[in-house]
Amino acid sequence: GKELIAEKVKTLVMMAGCFDGSNPSEYNVWKDIPAAQKIVAQWPTDLVFAPFELGVQVCYPATSIENDFAWAEDHPVVEAYKAYLPMPYDRPCWDPAALVYAVEGDKWFGVSDPGKISISDGGTTTFEVCENGRHRYLTVTPEQAAALTDHIVEIVTRQL
């Protein structure tokens, strides 16, 4: 239970929430508001949100989908993109950005001050700075977004 998490897990990174002041109920919160509320209220270690507004600033480029996977016939990434929407389109990197933070830390990001995240019964997320808070959320400047996009492309297109 919580004791094992507290002993073994340093930080939980979640792609969830929105902290830009527009107050939407972000999809990953909205799909199960009570579960999201329980996580932010009871998680025993640090919690970092990679919010909606971060992902839309870091978009995986259609040019990479169209050009960087030619080495494999019917590459599953290319086929998934084609099945989802007509090409070409850039796609927000919500989950890849959260994964990069979870694995590599804050090299590519800004990180909020410590605080407390709350989730309303309608699914909106709010953040209040507090000195002993265990919650944070990620941000990117335009320069960081461009560098992170390039980094994600480099990771995704790497041939093993």
What are the roles of these predicted feature ranges?
Residues 1-160:
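N-terminal acidic, glycine/proline-rich low-complexity segments
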